[in-house]
Amino acid sequence: MVQFYLLTLVFIVVDRFAKLFAINVLRDLPNGIVLVPDWFKLMYAENLGIAFGLRLLPPEGILLLALAISAGLTWYVWISQNRSPLFILTFALILGGGLGNLIDRLIFGHVVDFIYFDIYQGTLFGKYVSLWPIFNIADACITIGACLLFFFHDKIFNPR
């Protein structure tokens, strides 16, 4: 269990430092920092919703849902007898990412996003679209954890 909590803490700390950089540096740069022209930049954004900026619930509902999921995930790992490295990594990524965004919601009332891949911006069927959202380290942790869960389900839950 110690490894799980330490790894979760590492993901939270990395996310916090990255978001502090976004707040202290990127917020004052309207065009962000271009790392690969026309493709990848760091750019400050405030996300009031959940994934892809969707606002399916009011802010209080999102906060309560995030708290419930984090508590449920912590409880599940606690009662599980599975201590395989892949199990610990997968759930530490998901919990660390979830708690990283939860901390933002508690402090700021929104999530700080700053990683932007400019895959396509333009008109599609007469409507302006941007095909990739701005995200953060916590979102990446959740996504990587979910992908591990999907692709390595049998290895995670049936370790040898």
UniProtKB/Swiss-Prot annotation:
It is a multi-pass membrane protein. It catalyses: Release of signal peptides from bacterial membrane prolipoproteins. Hydrolyzes -Xaa-Yaa-Zaa-|-(S,diacylglyceryl)Cys-, in which Xaa is hydrophobic (preferably Leu), and Yaa (Ala or Ser) and Zaa (Gly or Ala) have small, neutral side chains. Keywords: Aspartyl protease, Cell inner membrane, Cell membrane, Hydrolase, Membrane, Protease, Transmembrane, Transmembrane helix. The chain crosses the membrane at residues 59-79, 84-104, 132-152. Its EC number is 3.4.23.36. The gene is lspA. Belongs to the peptidase A8 family. Pathway: Protein modification; lipoprotein biosynthesis (signal peptide cleavage). It is found in: Cell inner membrane. GO terms for biological process: proteolysis. GO terms for cellular component: plasma membrane. This is Lipoprotein signal peptidase. One of its GO terms (molecular function) is aspartic-type endopeptidase activity. Its main location: membrane. Pfam families: Peptidase_A8 (PF01252). NCBIfam families: lspA, PRK14787.1. This protein specifically catalyzes the removal of signal peptides from prolipoproteins. The active site is at residues 113, 139.
